[in-house]
């Protein structure tokens, strides 16, 4: 069942974010000082603790907002997504909360722990292909043949608005002297949503995106002036290993993001270590990217 994604103007996002229906399932996460890292750098570093969400990731926000915005007939038919990780779990939990069917197409190479996590949340797992692109193509076929609604991991204004509730929370939580927010970039939904709200509420704050050097799809898109498809992406930070960013997320980043930096694998590992030293939490590489 194909419900067209309604285009959104940039200045419409703040209101869409403020109306986002995420807190039935997500929680407002704390903004905590990284005491050890701050002392070492001689600068105050704050961390937004999205690892404390029910599925340990911000992805739940966008997935739930999308489902909560669908009409009853679409919910009755069910939803589908393609993902090898956090988006899959976010859609599965969101669907369980809304009591709707969720089909999750995952590559056959997906680690069993992630497959089991989706199944434990009630998702119907379909294993297909060796890579995300294969799973995505299969999901779009099943969307058409079974009358399901596809929940895109990033290139949908409702998903972007759900992720943008992090920006809404940051606007309330950040001290007045915060000068910059660093945001990991995969497909661009997280930074697009955060930038759309913070440039409205705290325009003086710089929004800086962070990508792995070997998966810098947004940097490539901005250099080309349009989304491009990378020939290859690294797999270390698999949560942000996207070959092509979204059309809408590209548009938002092009107009709202101040700067994008790229980091090597060694730097990502150092970020993971820094987070552990301050929180005793072990984050995945994509989670350590911003640090």
Task: Kindly label every feature range from the protein language model.
Residues 1-291:
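PLP-dependent amino-acid enzyme catalytic core
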